[in-house]
């Protein structure tokens, strides 16, 4: 029995779906890739789910409306505990960020789908944008005093030249660590599912006895799919927790 195993990394390849060449400003090539398509679909799904869950004209809320309100309450509690009640102006941003990452991760679990977070450019782009925004916020609030963040309180004067570069490197690493964490966790799960599915599919099309014996590994595989769905929620939540932590550092210089 021959096994045809494709690379588990093929699912992360960014391919052009529609390409358009325009003779504007010399030569312009416009193309819609699978990454761009699923990013647009993610934004559309986030908006559509909230519009459908709107409960403005109903006295009794629907189950979907209750689920959205519960999600909002959870994110609100996160922002309140991490940043403080006085800084709830950042709640819309954190809430939008949570649902964008969540829907992007969940849509990638659909067969033949594409996970936006498995693009290192998107993940690093998100973390870089947050890092730059948080840094600008800290400079706007504290001016020159913002640089005291790189000198831990109570540090002896003799250790300042040693600790400042360490703190600076640690701070700059945030621009990448946030995105790399999301990228690595989501990518690892999809690679594992691709490898297991590549082995199980030929076994099911084999002899009757082998097909029956494959039921148990398939049940385990189904459990891994459920675990990957849970990871979609966890990674969205962890990303928002760390973003709130960075916002708190910029606001309070802790």
Curated annotation (Swiss-Prot):
The keyword Ion transport applies. Disulfide bonds: none annotated. It is a multi-pass membrane protein. Residues 1-6 form a propeptide. InterPro entries: ATP_synth_F0_asu (IPR000568), ATP_synth_F0_asu_AS (IPR023011), ATP_synth_F0_asu_bact/mt (IPR045083), F0_ATP_A_sf (IPR035908). GO terms for cellular component: mitochondrial inner membrane; proton-transporting ATP synthase complex. GO terms for biological process: proton motive force-driven ATP synthesis. Keywords: ATP synthesis, CF(0), Hydrogen ion transport, Ion transport, Membrane, Mitochondrion, Mitochondrion inner membrane, Transmembrane, Transmembrane helix, Transport. GO terms for molecular function: proton transmembrane transporter activity. SUPFAM superfamilies: F1F0 ATP synthase subunit A. Pfam families: ATP-synt_A. The keyword Transport applies. It is found in: Mitochondrion inner membrane. The chain crosses the membrane at residues 32-52, 83-103, 119-139, 146-166, 182-202, 207-227, 228-248. F-type ATPases have 2 components, CF(1) - the catalytic core - and CF(0) - the membrane proton channel. CF(1) has five subunits: alpha(3), beta(3), gamma(1), delta(1), epsilon(1). CF(0) has three main subunits: a, b and c. Mitochondrial membrane ATP synthase (F(1)F(0) ATP synthase or Complex V) produces ATP from ADP in the presence of a proton gradient across the membrane which is generated by electron transport complexes of the respiratory chain. F-type ATPases consist of two structural domains, F(1) - containing the extramembraneous catalytic core and F(0) - containing the membrane proton channel, linked together by a central stalk and a peripheral stalk. During catalysis, ATP synthesis in the catalytic domain of F(1) is coupled via a rotary mechanism of the central stalk subunits to proton translocation. Belongs to the ATPase A chain family. This is ATP synthase subunit a. It comes from Mycosarcoma maydis. The lineage of its organism: Eukaryota, Fungi, Dikarya, Basidiomycota, Ustilaginomycotina. The gene is ATP6.
């Amino acid at each position: 029995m021959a096994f045809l195993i494709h690379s588990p990394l093929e699912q992360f390849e960014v391919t052009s779906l529609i390409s358009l060449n325009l003779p504007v400003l010399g030569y312009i090539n416009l193309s819609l890739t699978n990454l761009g398509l699923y990013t647009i679909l993610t934004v559309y799904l986030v908006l559509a789910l909230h519009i459908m869950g709107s409960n403005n004209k109903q006295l009794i809320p629907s189950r979907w409306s209750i689920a959205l309100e519960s999600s909002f309450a959870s994110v609100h509690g996160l922002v309140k505990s991490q940043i403080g009640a006085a800084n709830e102006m950042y709640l819309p941003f954190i809430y939008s960020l949570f649902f964008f990452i969540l829907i992007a991760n969940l849509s990638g679990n659909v067969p033949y789908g594409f996970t936006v977070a498995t693009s290192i450019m998107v993940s690093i782009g998100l973390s870089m944008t947050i890092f730059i925004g948080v840094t600008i916020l800290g400079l706007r609030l504290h001016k020159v005093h913002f640089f005291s963040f790189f000198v831990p309180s109570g540090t002896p004067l003799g250790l300042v030249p040693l600790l400042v570069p360490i703190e600076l490197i640690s701070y700059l690493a945030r621009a990448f660590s946030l995105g790399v964490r999301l990228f690595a966790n989501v990518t690892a799960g999809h690679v594992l599912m691709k490898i297991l599915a590549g082995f199980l599919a030929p076994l099911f099309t084999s002899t009757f006895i082998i097909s029956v014996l494959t039921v148990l590994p398939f049940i385990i595989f189904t459990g891994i799919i459920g675990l990957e769905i849970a990871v979609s929620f966890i990674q969205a939540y962890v990303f928002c927790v760390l973003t709130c932590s960075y916002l708190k550092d910029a606001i309070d210089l802790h």
